Amino acid sequence: EGDSVAACMKNWGFELPADATEADAFNAIVAKYPSLAEAVDAEKPEGTTFTSLLNDYETKYTKGIETGTSAANISGIKKTGDYSMTVSLTQVDATAIYQLGVTIAPMHYYGEKTKYNYENNQFGFDKGDLSHVREKTTTPLGAGPYKFIKFENGTVNFEANDSYYLGAPKTKYVNFLQTQEDDKLNGVVTGTVDITDPTFSSTTVDAIKAANKNDDVNGPAITTDTVDNLGYGYIGMSANTMNVNNEPGSDASKAYRKAFATVLAAYRTVAIESYYGERASVINYPISNTSWAAPQAADPGYKVAFSVDAQGKDIYTSDMNDEQKYEAALQAALTFFEAAGCKVENGKVVSNPEGGMDTANYAIEREALIPADGKGDHPSFMILTEASKALEKIGVHLIVTDLSDSTQLWDTIEADQADMFAAAWSATPDPDMYQIYFSGMDGKAAGGSNYMYDINDAELNQLILDARNSLGQSYRKTLYKSCLDIIVDWAVEVPVYQRQNAIIFSTQRVNMNTVTPDITTFYGWLNEVEKIELN
């Protein structure tokens, strides 16, 4: 999760240093899949090349666009002035605007003025001829506040672009340093770094307070700005492996998963408070709190995740202490196991839904995978271990496997062999749920991450499409609440936490009056970097 290269690559099973670059990510991919690079770069002994293995390579893969009888222009794109245009769509799509974040380049750069005649559908180049574009590959053009000067000894040097459209930046030079995670905070303290983004752990907080000498994360040495991370942590279950009679969407299968989810959910608060302290909060729906579609406690129909039994009765009361809540969760789990078809006697599960035993010693035995570096270093590790101890009391064996290599997690999920797993999602500004929860219908393919949970619900699919086809935020929020209720009912995802990210500034060297005020999850200090001045 998160925005760093290392965090993003971890979601795909790659362990990289905290300061990994995009080049490091590419090299890691090539290292894992060397045959791909070898096929592209070299011929096989018998003389077969990678491209020769592609059917009709010359006709299908050597041209970027179709020429000849193709359209002379795109009717939905209209020039309205020298510096303005409109884009029209064939249908309403709330997510379309996020697909239009394209880089703007002047015609004199990508084309030739002599070949431009808008009225005659000439746009500065010969259609299908990319030679002029390729000439610019080694001479990039940008319009940002700073110009790239060089990369040397782990430092990227930038110089102010005096022609920047919002005005020349106040600070002439900006350097970006390759830095190890452990060196970020120390760099600000010692004066080698002015702005950075350390992992906002308890250790980091204590070190910031020590530097400020005032028991506060804001002070004479360091100023801290925190925002909610664009994403959330969860514990997932595969509907294809965690079900009854190979019917993932049946009531019995949902009850089976809810039995586990109810116990897991009970330990979220103690685990997250232990791991993050005040820097994270427990969430009750599988959506980041940064989203406008996230349900709020005051909203009608809001429920604490997995807080009712199989009969729909609330299992917690306001006067319960933690131990009483854990016991209530166990008793509720037994009602769900019974609803799934398990036999329960004397407060224990004595048979699985099929009437037998999963193993010689346990009626039910399942495994939860967690990439905690083999040492329990993960926000959800305590949840799983405490839930495992609790489930043991009712005759259910939950194996918690702590993976030192997270690649095993993603490989197991993709192979459809994982029961439960702890992970996190990176979110997007729009709450569209197609990618994760849409299982395919009416000729539309399933979302690319649907395999994570294997959820397949016709009503959910339709709600996702309906929400895409509206621009009304209130209406879409209502639809997404219905989507979230269905996802919770499937019990394929236990929402766990919303954590914070931190940006720290050297109070001594950065003029904080010039830094972007009211930094948010979606709008950070870099959006107004041209305004920043040093003291």
Give the positions of each predicted feature.
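Aromatic- and charge-enriched surface segment that lines or borders ligand/interaction sites
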Residues: 1-53, 57, 80, 86, ...
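Gly/Pro-rich hinge or "lid" segments in bacterial periplasmic/extracellular proteins
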Residues: 44-74, 82, 89-93, 101-169, ...
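Alpha-to-beta junction loops
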Residues: 83-85, 184, 190-199, 387-390, ...
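Short, well-ordered beta-strand elements
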Residues: 85-86, 144-149, 156, 172-178, ...
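Detector for C-terminal structural segments
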Residues: 94, 262-305, 379-388, 411-535
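Ligand-site clamp/hinge motif
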Residues: 154-210
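Append "and occasionally in soluble cytosolic enzymes with long acidic Gly/Pro-rich linkers
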Residues: 157-159, 251-389, 531-533
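A bilobed periplasmic-binding-protein/Venus flytrap-type ligand-binding module shared by bacterial periplasmic
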Residues: 159-164, 227-255, 263, 272-273, ...
